[in-house]
Curated annotation (Swiss-Prot):
GO cellular component, one term: cytoplasm
Species of origin: Salmonella gallinarum (strain 287/91 / NCTC 13346)
Binding-site residues, Zn(2+) 1: 38, 63-64
Reactions this protein catalyses: L-threonine + NAD(+) = (2S)-2-amino-3-oxobutanoate + NADH + H(+)
Subcellular location(s) of the protein: Cytoplasm
Listed cofactors: Zn(2+)
Site for Important for catalytic activity for the proton relay mechanism but does not participate directly in the coordination of zinc atom, residues: 148
Example GO BP: L-threonine catabolic process to glycine
UniProt superkingdom: Bacteria
InterPro entries on file: ADH-like_C, ADH-like_N, ADH_Zn_CS, GroES-like_sf, L-Threonine_3-DHase, NAD(P)-bd_dom_sf, PKS_ER, Zn_alcohol_dh
Organism classification: Bacteria, Pseudomonadati, Pseudomonadota, Gammaproteobacteria, Enterobacterales
Gene3D superfamilies: Medium-chain alcohol dehydrogenases, catalytic domain, NAD(P)-binding Rossmann-like Domain
Protein name per the record: L-threonine 3-dehydrogenase
Leader sequence segment: none
Length: 341
């Protein structure tokens, strides 16, 4: 079958032919319809330090997708041929304390689809049936293909009560923009997002944020004054991994504020810990999606009127995958969809 693979320990990704995966007793075989390019896939393409330490070569990559069930393991119940599905890309062990306690997203033995095992940038994908999620009929293939990153956004945004709160989102990448849209949709008062990429800030404006702030040109404190905010932000969603953005967040949080961190900062990032301590801030690390509570919330948010369509900016045939990766690497895109039909 046709597949996009990391074939060499160097920059790039290559179309190749690989054997169709075999279906185990507890697995589903999924015929891929659409995939989306993740920032992780760009890291793998670029062959950065993280990729060199993490990705075995060769490896079929990709973990954002929607497809159709075409094969079912003999032990599987609850699915049938023809079901339209996406799936949780974190494969968990099922026997550690967190798995047995129902906190599977915190499994210490997690492996990643398209990272540690073959991914979805292929005509067919095999995953455990437990990881598959049926897509409701009123959710499009395009939206279903970005459920994985949308789940990161939902998990981060809904970590805290947002109704009536003032929310700061640092980082206007696709996940940050979706998190801001979720916050606004569920009842936050002011949702302010910051970045230095004007293209992506404009996407955030299309998604309905209160203010999208280019911090290279505009002061966040001035924006807060404009909005009549006198005490700081109640909730911070750190999506950028940029030390200056996190330091600004600490400066502008209200006392007792809560911060959810999805962005990955450098290991040597230095902050003023007195601000965390004396403001009584609560900081929560976010990894992946809660299985499967986040997935049910994703579907419900879309079904209740949350419009994610502006975040999808580019669509290509899989044969034009290079154009898709070029768009993602340029920084002048939202989500990029690759069609396998």
């Amino acid at each position: 079958m046709k597949a996009l693979s990391k074939l060499k320990a160097e920059e790039g990704i290559w179309m190749t032919d690989v054997p169709e995966p075999e279906v185990g007793h507890n697995d589903l075989l999924i015929k891929i319809r659409k995939t989306a390019i993740c920032g992780t896939d760009v890291h793998i393409y670029n062959w950065d330090d993280w990729s060199q330490k993490t990705i075995p070569v060769p490896m079929v990559v990709g973990h954002e997708y929607v497809g159709e069930v075409v094969g079912i393991g003999q032990e599987v119940k609850g699915f049938k041929i023809g079901d339209r599905v996406s799936g949780e890309g974190h494969i968990t062990c099922g026997h550690c304390r967190n798995c047995r306690g129902g906190r599977t997203h915190l499994c210490r033995n997690t492996t990643g689809v398209g990272v540690n095992r073959p991914g979805c940038f292929a005509e067919y994908l095999v995953i455990p049936a437990l990881n598959a999620f049926k897509i409701p009929d009123n959710i499009s293939d395009d939206l279903a293909s970005i459920f994985d990153p949308f789940g990161n956004a939902v998990h981060t945004a809904l970590s805290f009560d947002l109704v009536g709160e003032d929310v700061l989102v640092s980082g206007a990448g696709p996940i940050g923009v979706m998190a801001a849209a979720v916050a606004k949709h569920v009842g936050a008062r002011h949702v302010v997002i910051t970045d230095v990429n004007e293209y992506r800030l404009e996407l955030a404006r299309k998604m309905g944020v209160t203010r999208a702030v280019n911090v290279a040109k505009e002061s966040l404190n001035d924006v807060m004054a404009e909005l009549g905010m006198t005490e700081g932000f109640d909730v911070g969603l750190e999506m950028s991994g940029a030390p200056p953005a996190f330091c600004t967040m600490l400066d502008t949080m209200n006392h007792g504020g809560r911060i959810a961190m999805l962005g990955i900062p450098p290991s040597d990032m230095s902050i003023d810990w007195t601000k965390v301590i004396f403001k009584g801030l609560f900081i929560k690390g976010i990894y992946g999606r809660e299985m499967f509570e986040t997935w049910y919330k994703m579907a419900a948010l879309i079904q209740s009127g949350l419009d994610l369509s502006p975040i999808i900016t580019h669509r290509f045939s899989i044969d034009d995958f290079q154009k898709g990766f070029d768009a993602m690497r340029s920084g002048q895109s939202g989500k990029v969809i690759l069609s396998w039909d």
